Amino acid sequence: MPDQNTPDMQLIAFKGLIEHILNHCRRVLQHINPIFQRAGVDYFTHFYLIINKLIVVEAMSKLEIRESPDAVTTYEMYRAIKEIKKLKKSIPKEHRQQLQMANFHKCFQRNVNQWIDLATERCRSRIKQAIELDTVVQVTEDVQFSSSAVDGTEFLLLLMKLSDELEWPAKAEAFTFKIFVVKSVCECALFYVSEVYNRLRPEDMFNQQGNFRATEKLSIVLNNMQHIKTVIMKHLMEHSLEQSGKKLTEEEQDIQTHSKEVMGTIIQSAGEDISTKLASIICQIILKISPDITALIEAIVERKTPTTSLEMSVIDPLMSYLASNLHTLGNHLLTPVFQLILTDMWCMSSDCLQRVLNSDAAKKSSDRSQYTIQRSNSSYRASESSSMLMVLGSTWRA
């Protein structure tokens, strides 16, 4: 049986006492004090002033004797005292100035980083478990991402709310804690992206011959990463730009401005890191299809300028290859991800065509092909979404 007199056990017992006092305060306000008030006695004020001194003095002593008190216990204690403090509005104003509880948060200042670390650790653990239990979630008739992206988003949003739940009275310190929370959310978002990225296997992107193939799992992984990036970055930016509800001193305003700049940098960096992971997968796709597209373009350019409908079919193998790969991706990917792939595929095809034009073998049809590039690039700049397929086909069939 554990020793009840250890500092740990005393802290846990005191936390339970505070929670009991909170419940009793609410019961006194609702049921007991009205009875006393009918007799002209303000029972709640007397009771509140007594527990005010007891809580602050005892809480400080219990926390000071521990070098590293349990984070869960201290956080639950802090929340309970915070709720008790809010009840001061139920006592006369002249008594509120006497409250030692007004600065109770100072007792817990050294514990805040522990709370953030614990919340971050729990968020990462929940994210990992969500990935282990992944199931497919239908977004539209074709587009999908997995349950871990939905659950992961919820876990990240819960972590993000920690700085608001603290309601830390000292604004300068509150801004610092908010930065720590934003940093933790970004780290957990990157943890999710890295976990789903590392679970992507070669067979999810390539067949046994090493050729690219668009699979459901590839689409889901890309959609998951994009979903986390879009939702979390949006909420984080809104969170970082929130204004303090209280009037700030000039010094606090300067700290708030600096804090927003720091948080903006952290969020932007996290977004770029997620984009880098996405780009890494897309790069693998483009590298795999590059040899096939190069061969198909070389076959087109080596032909003379088409003059009959039979010769015009020389473009069809390239059109068919691009369409077969883009069709599946276009149907199953979120639009921003598909746009990234389409853009890179177009740039790679355009670069390949330019290289072929510069070769000796392409001299016979260089004028016609140069016109193709110029017209294609012009059209692509006007509309990125699908011009690659349309322009190549229409140019050679003109």
Where are these regions (language model features)?
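Extended alpha-helical scaffold/tether regions of large eukaryotic proteins
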Residues: M1-A398
